[in-house]
């Protein structure tokens, strides 16, 4: 199982989510109305603003601002990380389908044999989303964070 720290300071996961949510387009709007780089829905944005004590100046249009969108999105990923013990599969499923759906899936023995491990995601779109995010995350980790081989200095006279 791939896990993540509770603070979601993992740029690889954030990049994987942004890539699959908006293809790095800060002005993206989904067919359901989600906005910005991390495709945050209106109700979720309002809820996050309240949790961050920023509801007074918050408007849905602020989610087109990359800094605000990433701050809100990474806060939400951190929340999901704490809620789902850093399990990236459950975090990605929760980000895409909602944490309540993940909770319901975990309670169904067809999806989880132990009530903790999400072995089956019953909706195609969320299952595919999770697979794509986890694959991108692993690629980013290998490409950007894996130790690079060091080159031995050439011997003199060689």
Q: Where do the PLM segments sit?
A:
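Catalytic glycan-binding domains that act on GlcNAc-containing polysaccharides
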Residues: 1-158
């Amino acid at each position: 199982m791939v896990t993540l720290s509770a603070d979601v300071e993992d740029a690889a996961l954030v990049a994987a989510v942004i890539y699959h949510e908006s293809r790095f387009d800060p002005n993206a709007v989904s067919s359901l109305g989600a906005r910005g780089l991390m495709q945050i829905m209106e109700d979720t944005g309002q809820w996050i603003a309240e949790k961050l004590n920023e509801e007074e100046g918050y408007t849905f249009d602020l989610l087109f601002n990359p800094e605000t969108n990433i701050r809100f999105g990474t806060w939400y990923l951190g929340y999901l990380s704490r809620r789902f013990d850093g399990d990236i599969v459950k975090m990605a499923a929760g980000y895409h389908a909602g944490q309540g759906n993940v909770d319901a899936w975990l309670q169904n023995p067809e999806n989880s044999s132990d009530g903790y491990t999400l072995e089956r995601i019953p909706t195609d779109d969320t299952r595919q989303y999770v697979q794509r995010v986890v694959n991108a995350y692993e690629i980013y980790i290998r490409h950007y964070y894996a130790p690079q081989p060091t080159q031995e200095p050439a011997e003199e006279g060689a």
